[in-house]
């Protein structure tokens, strides 16, 4: 972990988000064979088992921090980790539309900016919009091959994906909030633990089995290890020293990579406008570490995150 301290937090978050970009295709592969709730429950079982040694110290730390931090942990786990992932997975595997659920994730920064202002006293400076607006335009270009003739299919897909985006954005802000008192590995462990409880409750409600078939279980294992444990470790390690406003912007690499991966997976080709969109996104994210002080007004010094032990 010490080697990661030399890497700007926003870049670690961008790398984690890019790893999440492979996630939708894997979930889409299980369409018709495994329910969304079963998939997400399986992920959380694996993740809790892998982080079990961290659980008791994490629980002690969060209860010592106070009820607000306990509430934040529950919302991150049950809301962002469990419910949001179930909704997003269902939007992918329960419908024929692959692109729309991914496209809608670009609303996350808007939610995160508002929540960060309310909860963390982070204020975007004028410089933020000089990076955010080109990134937003880039997403529009990447996600719409015909940018002046856009399309969106299915209100159910839109509703599920939008709810997931809001919950994930709130999870980003609350994760930053928790990092004021807890180390990143404790936030990670609590996310999985409360997420597993929520998934276990969702199984009987949705009438979903706890286990699928052997083939899909191997895919769930990949999701848990790569886009789950590894990506989220990088994410929370970077988030402890990155304002939530900047984090939400760097997370936009996720839908960009997901759309591009989906296009190639389904034997499609990028138009020149889509490549322009990719360039705008990469440019905005790359400039973040160098423009940080001009982009966001951060919280007072006494509210900065707890130092990592690694």
Task: Annotate each predicted stretch with a short phrase.
Residues 102-105, 121-141, 151-157, 213-214, ...:
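Loop-to-transmembrane alpha-helix entry segments
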